[in-house]
């Protein structure tokens, strides 16, 4: 059995299929783990979601910011942008089934026997594994409620929940978890989230900002963290316990697959149209 982890697919289904064929992926034997953002911008978000849904227990994903945005679009809480290429998905006959499947997915997954943790954007450095589990579970519980659109999705868009407060309750607590696990790139030196800078660290001109993974973290001492979201990194982090897998396929770059057991990365260049 092999465990394969894939970066932000974002509708780049042809590239995903190329990678899986290259490694002879077999869902009856292997598992495919995705760092989230299965949809948006790429040409085939519909096929991507259908494929992961069809994998059953052989497919594991976490929610990314674009996946959560899809829930808002389907709930008519946001307006679709043509550049996201989501119209075929939103108008698909099985959209209700796909949305229901998507909102059952968590914000974090772990592979305890390998001490691997996967989220979309990373893990706040001040969080322990127990806190990560707890906060992720609170969001998952809210997403599974029948009123999830009104109670959570309609109110999750906020840049105000940028600081971890273990005494927070209600929406602010859920918002921080969503912001941290699906949007985080940089933190200010005092530990609160920045939502603006997307550049790679070498190009960041604000001396008050540091990448989240440069802060001391007890969790990262004991576990390998797999994440995506930050395409500008192009997979380059100087820590063997960090696996940055978003390499910008939807922007014309690469889709990256990481074979856990071999600690090997395989890449597929964005395919040309036609």
From Swiss-Prot:
Biological processes, Gene Ontology terms: RNA decapping
Enzyme Commission number(s) of this protein: 3.6.1.41
Organism per entry: Shewanella sp. (strain MR-7)
A Gene Ontology term for the protein's cellular component: cytoplasm
Recorded GO MF terms: bis(5'-nucleosyl)-tetraphosphatase (symmetrical) activity; phosphatase activity
Catalytic reaction annotation: P(1),P(4)-bis(5'-adenosyl) tetraphosphate + H2O = 2 ADP + 2 H(+)
Name of the protein this chain belongs to: Bis(5'-nucleosyl)-tetraphosphatase, symmetrical
InterPro entries: Ap4A_hydrolase, ApaH, Calcineurin-like_PHP_ApaH, Metallo-depent_PP-like
Function: Hydrolyzes diadenosine 5',5'''-P1,P4-tetraphosphate to yield ADP.
Keywords: Hydrolase
Top-rank EC class of the record's enzyme: hydrolase
PANTHER family documented for this protein: BIS(5'-NUCLEOSYL)-TETRAPHOSPHATASE [SYMMETRICAL], METALLOPHOSPHOESTERASE
Highest taxon, organism lineage: Bacteria
Gene3D superfamilies recorded: 3.60.21.10
Protein's UniProt keywords contain Hydrolase: yes
NCBIfam families, sorted: apaH, PRK00166.1
Family: Belongs to the Ap4A hydrolase family.
